Amino acid sequence: MTKSYSESGLMGEPQPQGPPSWTDECLSSQDEEHEADKKEDDLETMNAEEDSLRNGGEEEDEDEDLEEEEEEEEEDDDQKPKRRGPKKKKMTKARLERFKLRRMKANARERNRMHGLNAALDNLRKVVPCYSKTQKLSKIETLRLAKNYIWALSEILRSGKSPDLVSFVQTLCKGLSQPTTNLVAGCLQLNPRTFLPEQNQDMPPHLPTASASFPVHPYSYQSPGLPSPPYGTMDSSHVFHVKPPPHAYSAALEPFFESPLTDCTSPSFDGPLSPPLSINGNFSFKHEPSAEFEKNYAFTMHYPAATLAGAQSHGSIFSGTAAPRCEIPIDNIMSFDSHSHHERVMSAQLNAIFHD
């Protein structure tokens, strides 16, 4: 049995290969283009990944810094006492400028307020009954004196009567310091030792106290200062002029004045004076009769004309046979005997002076 040519060729003999065709070349060029595109895409993706990694690292660094700052602040807050309210913001330039502007406005408001307060206190110092060219009252002393002055004037208006000068000055000086009290006493021409109760206790018994029945100022005068609103204000040129007391009882009244008294003529005794009242800007003292003065120092005896002839008549006054010839009030004798010998002599001298 024999094989055909075709079969033998297909089975054993290899067929020769020809040159590559144009289709194969097209396919190979397309594959190269695809590979180049893939490489470019890979490079772009790699660059993008690198950029993202860099940016991510920076963000992570910032986040880490913020976390560290927050941790430090928390540690500081743990060490310090916790503050209530909103957290303090960081100061920027704009905030600093706004803060400075607010402080400047607040300082200006406070400065204007203090200037107005000082001006009002200066006006008040011109009204209160205290004036000195060398000394200036403090703010608290000015307010205290003004309060006492208003209280004293309101008491005068309420009662409708003029109180005693000593009580008026005591009301003015209530709660004031010693320098202010001395200034008030100097303006009213008084000795502060005469109306201070704590000092009256230490005074010797032979010196007259503030409650003495004879007046401190047995005369009338007008002082252009010490007005009360709305009658006027006190000017710095006003000076307080006071006349000295009469010659006959200057020694008895000397403790009430700072300076020694001089001799001068004076009108007759008119009784104690009331506290100063402001009328058209001038202070005047009003004479008032004093029942207490007549009560304390009235020791009267009604003698017949014949009993004053000789010494025998004086000896017979206190005898039993001479009782019908004189009249001696019993209450006056008791009140007179209660005084000491020195006060008895002083009262007798004053009685002789005032009733002659």
UniProtKB/Swiss-Prot annotation:
Residues 1-94 are annotated as: Disordered. The keyword Transcription applies. Keywords: Activator, Cytoplasm, Developmental protein, Diabetes mellitus, Differentiation, Disease variant, DNA-binding, Neurogenesis, Nucleus, Phosphoprotein, Transcription, Transcription regulation. Residues 81-93 have a biased composition (Basic residues). Residues 101-153 form the bHLH domain. Residues 58-78 have a biased composition (Acidic residues). Changing V242I: Found in one consanguineous family with non-syndromic autosomal recessive retinitis pigmentosa; uncertain significance. It is found in: Cytoplasm; Nucleus. GO terms for cellular component: chromatin; cytoplasm; nucleoplasm; nucleus; RNA polymerase II transcription regulator complex. Phosphorylated. In islet cells, phosphorylated on Ser-274 upon glucose stimulation; which may be required for nuclear localization. In activated neurons, phosphorylated on Ser-335; which promotes dendritic growth. Phosphorylated by MAPK1; phosphorylation regulates heterodimerization and DNA-binding activities. Phosphorylation on Ser-266 and Ser-274 increases transactivation on the insulin promoter in glucose-stimulated insulinoma cells. One of its GO terms (biological process) is insulin secretion. The modification Phosphoserine is found at S162, S259, S266, S274, S335. Acts as a transcriptional activator: mediates transcriptional activation by binding to E box-containing promoter consensus core sequences 5'-CANNTG-3'. Associates with the p300/CBP transcription coactivator complex to stimulate transcription of the secretin gene as well as the gene encoding the cyclin-dependent kinase inhibitor CDKN1A. Efficient DNA-binding requires dimerization with another bHLH protein. Heterodimer with TCF3/E47; the heterodimer is inhibited in presence of ID2, but not NR0B2, to E-box element. Interacts with EP300; the interaction is inhibited by NR0B2. Interacts with RREB1. Interacts with ATOH8. This is Neurogenic differentiation factor 1. It comes from Homo sapiens. The lineage of its organism: Eukaryota, Metazoa, Chordata, Craniata, Vertebrata.
